[in-house]
Amino acid sequence: MQERKAAVNRDTLETQISVALNLDGTGAAAFATGVPFLEHMMDQIARHGMIDLDVRCQGDTHIDDHHSVEDIGITIGQAMHQAVGDKRGIRRYGHAYVPLDEALSRVVIDFSGRPGLEMHIPFTQKRIGSFDTELFWEFFQGFVNHAGVTLHIDCLRGHNAHHQIETVFKAFGRALRMALEVDPRMGNAMPSTKGTL
């Protein structure tokens, strides 16, 4: 099977980003983004998705984190799209429930080629430390638009905002792992009756 790796650079007047990933990795991660809480969350994607993920960003964080967070989501989405290739042989769909103490989240993903995001997280705080929780929407919307996936995110319960979003990212990683897994029974077939995704 062809290696499922990608490296993408994205340069704008607001951010300069590089992302390298390996879908068949061991969960190794390295980050230098200037946004520490997002790095903590991306580490969950790598660890629970068994994806090697390296993300570097120089952004205008002296203004705020918005551009960096959104553009990192975009660039990871572009790299994911490139690494997946034509999607032959993958399971395509993935889902996971993940708890953390009182919090519980569900994430469902479809590598359909159709970008779509439904995200429902009733955050109990507007900020986690200095991080604005509204930016998680920007991260996932950027990812979805450029990975070409349908993504449903629901935090079902929780009263600690850190726990709420950590369960989301852990479930996201596990759903990715399931969807991207190669199904030996599929052979080289496309996981769609249309014959294309």
UniProtKB/Swiss-Prot annotation:
It is an enzyme of class 4 (lyase). Pathway: Amino-acid biosynthesis; L-histidine biosynthesis; L-histidine from 5-phospho-alpha-D-ribose 1-diphosphate: step 6/9. One of its GO terms (cellular component) is cytoplasm. Its main location: cytoplasm. SUPFAM superfamilies: Ribosomal protein S5 domain 2-like. Its EC number is 4.2.1.19. GO terms for biological process: L-histidine biosynthetic process. It catalyses: D-erythro-1-(imidazol-4-yl)glycerol 3-phosphate = 3-(imidazol-4-yl)-2-oxopropyl phosphate + H2O. It is found in: Cytoplasm. GO terms for molecular function: imidazoleglycerol-phosphate dehydratase activity. Keywords: Amino-acid biosynthesis, Cytoplasm, Histidine biosynthesis, Lyase. Belongs to the imidazoleglycerol-phosphate dehydratase family. HAMAP family: HisB. NCBIfam families: PRK00951.1-1, PRK00951.1-5, PRK00951.2-1, PRK00951.2-4. This is Imidazoleglycerol-phosphate dehydratase. It comes from Teredinibacter turnerae (strain ATCC 39867 / T7901).
